[in-house]
DNA sequence: ATTATTTGACCTAG
DNA sequence: CTAGGTCAAATAAT
Protein backbone atom coordinates (compact mmCIF):
# COMPACT_ATOMS: atom_id res chain seq x y z
CA UNK A 1 0.00 0.00 0.00
CA UNK A 2 1.06 3.52 -0.62
CA UNK A 3 0.55 6.39 1.69
CA UNK A 4 -0.05 9.82 0.32
CA UNK A 5 3.13 11.01 1.82
CA UNK A 6 4.89 8.53 -0.33
CA UNK A 7 3.15 9.66 -3.45
CA UNK A 8 3.78 13.32 -2.97
CA UNK A 9 7.34 12.50 -2.20
CA UNK A 10 7.51 10.71 -5.50
CA UNK A 11 5.99 13.75 -7.06
CA UNK A 12 8.83 15.78 -5.68
CA UNK A 13 11.24 13.52 -7.41
CA UNK A 14 9.41 13.88 -10.68
CA UNK A 15 9.48 17.62 -10.41
CA UNK A 16 13.13 17.52 -9.58
CA UNK A 17 13.75 15.53 -12.70
CA UNK A 18 11.85 18.04 -14.76
CA UNK A 19 13.84 20.85 -13.26
CA UNK A 20 17.00 19.03 -14.02
CA UNK A 21 15.88 18.53 -17.58
CA UNK A 22 15.16 22.20 -17.97
CA UNK A 23 18.53 23.01 -16.59
CA UNK A 24 20.12 20.78 -19.18
CA UNK A 25 18.10 22.46 -21.89
CA UNK A 26 19.23 25.85 -20.76
CA UNK A 27 22.84 24.88 -20.62
CA UNK A 28 22.63 23.36 -24.06
CA UNK A 29 20.97 26.47 -25.32
CA UNK A 30 23.70 28.73 -24.06
CA UNK A 31 26.47 26.70 -25.57
CA UNK A 32 24.66 25.81 -28.73
CA UNK A 33 26.76 27.74 -31.25
CA UNK A 34 30.07 26.22 -30.37
CA UNK A 35 28.83 22.73 -29.88
CA UNK A 36 30.35 19.91 -31.91
CA UNK A 37 27.77 17.47 -33.23
CA UNK A 38 29.00 14.63 -31.06
CA UNK A 39 28.58 16.43 -27.81
CA UNK A 40 25.32 17.80 -29.09
CA UNK A 41 24.12 14.28 -29.45
CA UNK A 42 25.22 13.48 -25.95
CA UNK A 43 23.42 16.48 -24.55
CA UNK A 44 20.24 15.66 -26.38
CA UNK A 45 20.39 12.10 -25.22
CA UNK A 46 20.71 13.19 -21.69
CA UNK A 47 17.85 15.63 -22.01
CA UNK A 48 15.59 13.14 -23.69
CA UNK A 49 16.37 10.54 -21.12
CA UNK A 50 15.72 12.91 -18.25
CA UNK A 51 12.33 13.94 -19.51
CA UNK A 52 11.52 10.44 -20.52
CA UNK A 53 12.26 9.18 -17.05
CA UNK A 54 10.15 11.90 -15.56
CA UNK A 55 7.40 10.97 -17.94
CA UNK A 56 7.49 7.32 -16.98
CA UNK A 57 7.47 8.18 -13.35
CA UNK A 58 4.63 10.59 -13.68
CA UNK A 59 2.59 8.08 -15.59
CA UNK A 60 2.94 5.59 -12.83
CA UNK A 61 2.01 8.12 -10.23
CA UNK A 62 -1.09 9.08 -12.11
CA UNK A 63 -2.06 5.47 -12.50
CA UNK A 64 -1.76 5.00 -8.82
CA UNK A 65 -3.55 8.17 -8.08
CA UNK A 66 -6.39 7.31 -10.40
CA UNK A 67 -6.75 3.84 -9.09
CA UNK A 68 -6.93 5.08 -5.55
CA UNK A 69 -9.47 7.77 -6.19
CA UNK A 70 -12.41 6.30 -7.95
CA UNK A 71 -12.81 9.56 -9.81
CA UNK A 72 -11.51 10.05 -13.28
CA UNK A 73 -11.47 13.64 -14.32
CA UNK A 74 -7.85 14.47 -13.91
CA UNK A 75 -6.48 13.68 -17.32
CA UNK A 76 -7.63 16.56 -19.47
CA UNK A 77 -6.57 18.98 -16.85
CA UNK A 78 -3.11 17.75 -16.14
CA UNK A 79 -1.58 19.53 -19.06
CA UNK A 80 -2.76 22.90 -17.92
CA UNK A 81 -1.63 22.17 -14.44
CA UNK A 82 1.82 21.40 -15.73
CA UNK A 83 1.77 24.60 -17.66
CA UNK A 84 0.66 26.59 -14.72
CA UNK A 85 3.37 25.11 -12.63
CA UNK A 86 5.98 25.84 -15.20
CA UNK A 87 4.92 29.41 -15.49
CA UNK A 88 5.27 29.83 -11.80
CA UNK A 89 8.56 28.08 -11.69
CA UNK A 90 10.33 29.34 -14.74
CA UNK A 91 8.68 32.36 -16.27
CA UNK A 92 11.92 33.25 -17.94
CA UNK A 93 12.20 29.94 -19.66
CA UNK A 94 8.60 30.06 -20.79
CA UNK A 95 9.16 33.43 -22.31
CA UNK A 96 12.17 32.16 -24.16
CA UNK A 97 10.11 29.47 -25.73
CA UNK A 98 7.33 31.80 -26.68
CA UNK A 99 9.76 34.01 -28.49
CA UNK A 100 11.60 31.25 -30.16
CA UNK A 101 8.85 28.98 -31.20
CA UNK A 102 6.33 31.65 -31.91
CA UNK A 103 3.75 30.90 -29.33
CA UNK A 104 0.71 33.06 -29.09
CA UNK A 105 -0.62 34.40 -25.84
CA UNK A 106 -0.61 31.00 -24.32
CA UNK A 107 2.46 29.04 -23.48
CA UNK A 108 2.78 27.05 -26.63
CA UNK A 109 6.38 26.14 -26.61
CA UNK A 110 6.43 24.53 -23.27
CA UNK A 111 2.99 23.18 -23.75
CA UNK A 112 4.26 21.36 -26.79
CA UNK A 113 7.16 20.05 -24.80
CA UNK A 114 4.87 18.49 -22.30
CA UNK A 115 1.92 17.59 -24.39
CA UNK A 116 3.70 14.66 -25.85
CA UNK A 117 4.53 13.27 -22.51
CA UNK A 118 1.30 13.96 -20.79
CA UNK A 119 -0.91 12.78 -23.58
CA UNK A 120 0.67 9.45 -23.16
CA UNK A 121 -1.20 9.22 -19.92
CA UNK A 122 -4.33 8.47 -21.85
CA UNK A 123 -2.63 5.70 -23.68
CA UNK A 124 -3.05 3.50 -20.66
CA UNK A 125 0.39 2.05 -20.56
CA UNK A 126 0.05 -0.91 -18.30
CA UNK A 127 3.11 -0.93 -16.19
CA UNK A 128 4.33 -2.72 -13.23
CA UNK A 129 3.63 0.04 -10.80
CA UNK A 130 4.76 -1.63 -7.70
CA UNK A 131 8.14 -2.62 -8.98
CA UNK A 132 9.36 0.87 -9.66
CA UNK A 133 7.71 2.55 -6.74
CA UNK A 134 8.88 0.35 -3.96
CA UNK A 135 12.34 -0.11 -5.15
CA UNK A 136 14.28 0.81 -2.04
CA UNK A 137 14.18 -2.66 -0.68
CA UNK A 138 16.69 -4.68 1.24
CA UNK A 139 20.32 -4.36 0.45
CA UNK A 140 23.58 -5.69 1.67
CA UNK A 141 23.52 -5.03 5.36
CA UNK A 142 27.21 -4.42 5.68
CA UNK A 143 28.28 -1.67 3.34
CA UNK A 144 31.76 -0.47 4.17
CA UNK A 145 30.38 3.00 4.77
CA UNK A 146 32.07 5.53 2.62
CA UNK A 147 33.73 8.33 4.46
CA UNK A 148 33.63 11.95 3.57
CA UNK A 149 36.53 13.47 1.83
CA UNK A 150 38.15 16.72 2.54
CA UNK A 151 37.16 20.03 1.01
CA UNK A 152 33.76 19.74 -0.60
CA UNK A 153 33.79 22.74 -2.84
CA UNK A 154 32.72 26.21 -2.07
CA UNK A 155 32.05 27.70 1.28
CA UNK A 156 30.09 30.71 2.28
CA UNK A 157 29.96 32.32 5.66
CA UNK A 158 27.26 34.69 6.75
CA UNK A 159 26.59 36.56 9.94
CA UNK A 160 22.97 36.83 10.82
CA UNK A 161 21.18 38.49 13.69
CA UNK A 162 19.12 36.40 16.02
CA UNK A 163 15.45 37.14 16.04
CA UNK A 164 14.66 39.54 18.80
CA UNK A 165 11.05 38.50 18.92
CA UNK A 166 10.32 36.96 22.25
CA UNK A 167 11.30 33.36 22.41
CA UNK A 168 14.17 31.12 21.61
CA UNK A 169 16.50 32.78 19.26
CA UNK A 170 17.95 29.73 17.72
CA UNK A 171 16.76 29.04 14.20
CA UNK A 172 17.87 31.63 11.66
CA UNK A 173 15.63 30.93 8.72
CA UNK A 174 16.94 31.06 5.20
CA UNK A 175 14.73 29.79 2.42
CA UNK A 176 15.87 26.24 2.39
CA UNK A 177 14.74 23.31 4.42
CA UNK A 178 17.41 21.88 6.63
CA UNK A 179 17.69 18.88 8.80
CA UNK A 180 19.84 18.97 11.87
CA UNK A 181 22.17 16.05 12.12
CA UNK A 182 24.53 16.98 14.84
CA UNK A 183 25.69 19.36 17.50
CA UNK A 184 29.06 19.75 19.03
CA UNK A 185 30.79 21.72 21.73
CA UNK A 186 33.59 23.65 20.15
CA UNK A 187 36.77 24.39 21.97
CA UNK A 188 36.93 28.01 22.94
CA UNK A 189 33.34 28.64 22.07
CA UNK A 190 30.78 29.33 24.66
CA UNK A 191 28.04 27.92 22.49
CA UNK A 192 27.68 24.66 20.65
CA UNK A 193 27.87 24.42 16.89
CA UNK A 194 24.92 22.92 15.07
CA UNK A 195 25.19 20.93 11.89
CA UNK A 196 22.51 20.84 9.23
CA UNK A 197 22.13 19.19 5.88
CA UNK A 198 19.60 19.70 3.13
CA UNK A 199 16.35 17.94 3.86
CA UNK A 200 16.26 16.69 0.29
CA UNK A 201 19.61 15.02 0.45
CA UNK A 202 17.77 11.89 -0.50
CA UNK A 203 16.54 13.38 -3.75
CA UNK A 204 19.75 12.39 -5.12
CA UNK A 205 22.83 13.65 -3.46
CA UNK A 206 22.02 17.19 -2.61
CA UNK A 207 25.27 18.00 -0.83
CA UNK A 208 24.23 21.28 0.73
CA UNK A 209 25.10 21.64 4.38
CA UNK A 210 25.40 24.39 6.90
CA UNK A 211 26.78 25.05 10.32
CA UNK A 212 25.32 27.48 12.77
CA UNK A 213 27.45 28.92 15.49
CA UNK A 214 26.53 31.57 18.01
CA UNK A 215 29.27 34.10 18.42
CA UNK A 216 31.19 34.19 21.62
CA UNK A 217 31.08 37.90 22.11
CA UNK A 218 27.70 38.58 20.63
CA UNK A 219 25.13 35.93 21.49
CA UNK A 220 22.62 37.76 19.35
CA UNK A 221 24.53 36.95 16.22
CA UNK A 222 25.08 33.68 14.47
CA UNK A 223 27.78 32.67 12.12
CA UNK A 224 26.27 30.48 9.45
CA UNK A 225 28.59 28.58 7.18
CA UNK A 226 27.20 27.02 4.03
CA UNK A 227 28.95 24.23 2.21
CA UNK A 228 28.02 22.89 -1.18
CA UNK A 229 25.21 24.26 -3.24
CA UNK A 230 21.84 22.69 -3.67
CA UNK A 231 21.41 20.19 -6.43
CA UNK A 232 17.87 19.62 -5.39
CA UNK A 233 15.50 22.21 -6.67
CA UNK A 234 13.39 22.36 -3.61
CA UNK A 235 14.03 25.66 -2.00
CA UNK A 236 11.08 26.87 -0.05
CA UNK A 237 9.40 29.65 -1.95
CA UNK A 238 10.72 33.12 -1.31
CA UNK A 239 7.54 34.71 -2.52
CA UNK A 240 8.00 38.17 -3.89
CA UNK A 241 5.25 39.56 -1.70
CA UNK A 242 6.26 38.02 1.56
CA UNK A 243 9.61 39.69 1.77
CA UNK A 244 9.89 39.30 5.47
CA UNK A 245 13.49 38.55 6.11
CA UNK A 246 13.41 36.70 9.35
CA UNK A 247 17.06 36.50 8.81
CA UNK A 248 19.11 39.62 8.51
CA UNK A 249 22.48 39.24 6.93
CA UNK A 250 24.97 41.50 8.57
CA UNK A 251 27.92 40.65 6.48
CA UNK A 252 28.98 37.85 4.27
CA UNK A 253 31.95 36.34 2.58
CA UNK A 254 31.19 34.44 -0.55
CA UNK A 255 33.25 32.02 -2.52
CA UNK A 256 30.47 30.35 -4.36
CA UNK A 257 27.42 30.74 -6.45
CA UNK A 258 24.02 29.23 -5.97
CA UNK A 259 20.81 29.04 -7.90
CA UNK A 260 17.44 29.76 -6.42
CA UNK A 261 14.15 28.75 -7.88
CA UNK A 262 10.97 30.60 -7.16
CA UNK A 263 8.69 27.86 -6.05
CA UNK A 264 9.10 24.77 -4.01
CA UNK A 265 8.60 21.51 -5.73
CA UNK A 266 6.93 20.38 -2.58
CA UNK A 267 4.26 22.96 -3.18
CA UNK A 268 3.89 21.73 -6.73
CA UNK A 269 3.17 18.30 -5.46
CA UNK A 270 0.58 19.74 -3.17
CA UNK A 271 -1.12 21.49 -6.03
CA UNK A 272 -1.48 18.25 -7.88
CA UNK A 273 -2.15 15.79 -5.15
CA UNK A 274 -3.23 17.87 -2.24
CA UNK A 275 -1.61 17.71 1.13
CA UNK A 276 -4.63 16.59 3.06
CA UNK A 277 -6.11 13.22 3.68
CA UNK A 278 -6.62 10.31 1.36
CA UNK A 279 -8.99 10.52 -1.50
CA UNK A 280 -10.43 13.85 -0.57
CA UNK A 281 -10.84 17.00 -2.54
CA UNK A 282 -10.58 16.59 -6.27
CA UNK A 283 -10.46 20.34 -6.66
CA UNK A 284 -6.72 20.25 -6.50
CA UNK A 285 -6.82 21.08 -10.14
CA UNK A 286 -7.21 24.75 -9.54
CA UNK A 287 -5.25 27.29 -7.59
CA UNK A 288 -6.04 27.69 -3.97
CA UNK A 289 -7.91 30.94 -4.29
CA UNK A 290 -10.16 29.65 -7.00
CA UNK A 291 -13.69 30.96 -6.60
CA UNK A 292 -16.04 28.07 -6.49
C1' DA B 1 2.90 6.12 10.71
C1' DT B 2 6.28 9.20 8.93
C1' DT B 3 9.64 12.61 9.52
C1' DA B 4 12.63 15.47 12.56
C1' DT B 5 15.77 16.19 16.59
C1' DT B 6 18.72 14.81 20.22
C1' DT B 7 22.83 12.94 21.71
C1' DG B 8 26.69 9.72 22.66
C1' DA B 9 29.45 6.87 19.76
C1' DC B 10 32.25 6.63 15.99
C1' DC B 11 35.45 8.28 12.43
C1' DT B 12 39.28 10.78 10.43
C1' DA B 13 42.67 14.47 9.70
C1' DG B 14 46.26 16.61 11.86
C1' DC C 1 45.58 11.70 21.16
C1' DT C 2 42.50 15.53 20.27
C1' DA C 3 39.08 18.21 18.01
C1' DG C 4 35.69 18.65 14.82
C1' DG C 5 32.44 16.41 11.85
C1' DT C 6 29.01 12.68 11.08
C1' DC C 7 26.20 8.51 12.14
C1' DA C 8 22.48 6.35 13.99
C1' DA C 9 19.50 4.71 17.75
C1' DA C 10 16.34 6.50 20.72
C1' DT C 11 13.12 9.88 21.23
C1' DA C 12 10.07 13.66 20.08
C1' DA C 13 7.04 15.93 17.18
C1' DT C 14 3.56 16.15 13.53
Swiss-Prot record:
GO annotation terms (biological process): regulation of gene expression
An MF annotation (GO) of this entry: DNA-binding transcription factor activity
Transmembrane annotation, as ranges: none
Swiss-Prot/TrEMBL keywords: DNA-binding, Nucleus, Transcription, Transcription regulation
Segments of this protein annotated with the region Disordered: 133-155
Pfam families in the record: WRKY
DNA-binding region: 167-235
Protein's name according to its UniProt entry: WRKY transcription factor 55
Organism: Arabidopsis thaliana
Gene: WRKY55
